[in-house]
Amino acid sequence: LSMVANWNAIRLNAQQRYQTETSFGFWTFGASAAKLQSRVAALESVTFHHELGSLRDKTDRLIELAGHLARLLDEDADNCQRAAQLCKADLVTDMVGEFPDLQGIMGRYYATHGREKKAIGRAIEEHYHPRHAGDALPQSKAGRILAVADRIDSLIGLFAVGEFPS
């Protein structure tokens, strides 16, 4: 329970820092709120794993896997694939670079302010959950599908290149 309380305190602190910084003009809407789609190409320059490629490569795998899982589970595959396409794009924004604890939260914000469907923004945020023991699970079906797809990709990929949990 104390771990959850600590995480909530950290998240609250990060959100308060974000609000303080934005009020002083650290982050301007025009520069940082570019549509997430425009940031997807930049994922090519971020290494996910030296044998598994870039975050763009991971994103491409997530699109495929999320679509497959969505069809198996009778969920909107287009929404799941769109969320998969955008879910890592906030990692290359200045805001998440400065405040890494806001990954996913900012992804949802950028998605909804970039006129993506609310369900897509929610799935983007939720796919990081649970972040730690005791954290909330994704509440939307698309969020659960994307969260599972992300973990499947990481686990299978890392096992495939001979990396195992210690």
Predicted segments with their positions:
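Amphipathic alpha-helical "coupling" segments that flank catalytic cores
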Residues: 1-166
